[in-house]
């Protein structure tokens, strides 16, 4: 295992979406990894991604439920679910992938890390598409 000379701090985005009257609040948690093994860092990343994925699925289900209302769909609710709550989670997932990829490449520059790269591309595309949808939705409100 390759040693890194300087202490590495990897920012894993642990998100807590608190449902308050203002529609939600996003908190970012930093995790210092200076005294952790590469496996512990990777495990933290995976746990964070799992939590974010669960939140993404829950919000996607809420969005599907809202859209199933047909003509009774509330555009404001769709905007709140998609643009206020879901976009920050998608951004956090992308940042997690970027941070993990950087960490893994610093540990072993010759490793391909194709799985992380594929996840990063997928999360970038989903975030971009969702942001574009939010711009269109906002113009309708």
Go through the PLM ranges and name each one.
Residues 21-78, 135-141:
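Immediate post-signal-peptide N-terminus of mature secreted/exported proteins
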Residues 14, 130-132:
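A generic structural signal for ordered secondary structure
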Residues 15-20:
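Sec/Tat signal peptide C-region and signal peptidase I cleavage site
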Residues 76-130:
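Long, amphipathic, charge-rich alpha-helical segments that form helical bundles/coiled-coils
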Residues 9-10, 62-63, 124:
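Enrichment for repetitive, rod-forming helical segments
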Residues 4-13:
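Sec-dependent N-terminal signal peptides
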């Amino acid at each position: 295992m390759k040693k890194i000379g300087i202490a590495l701090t990897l920012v894993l985005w642990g998100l807590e979406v608190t449902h308050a009257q203002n529609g939600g609040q996003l908190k970012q948690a930093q995790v210092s990894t200076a005294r952790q093994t590469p496996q512990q860092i990777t495990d933290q990343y995976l746990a964070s991604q799992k939590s974010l994925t669960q939140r993404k699925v829950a919000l996607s289900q809420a969005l599907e439920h809202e859209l199933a209302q047909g003509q009774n769909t509330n555009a404001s609710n769709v905007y709140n679910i998609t643009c206020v709550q879901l976009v920050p989670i998608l951004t956090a997932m992308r940042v997690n992938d970027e941070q993990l990829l950087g960490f893994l490449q610093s540990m072993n520059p010759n490793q391909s890390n194709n799985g992380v790269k594929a996840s990063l591309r997928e999360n970038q595309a989903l975030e971009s598409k969702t942001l574009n949808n939010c711009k269109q939705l906002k113009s309708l409100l």
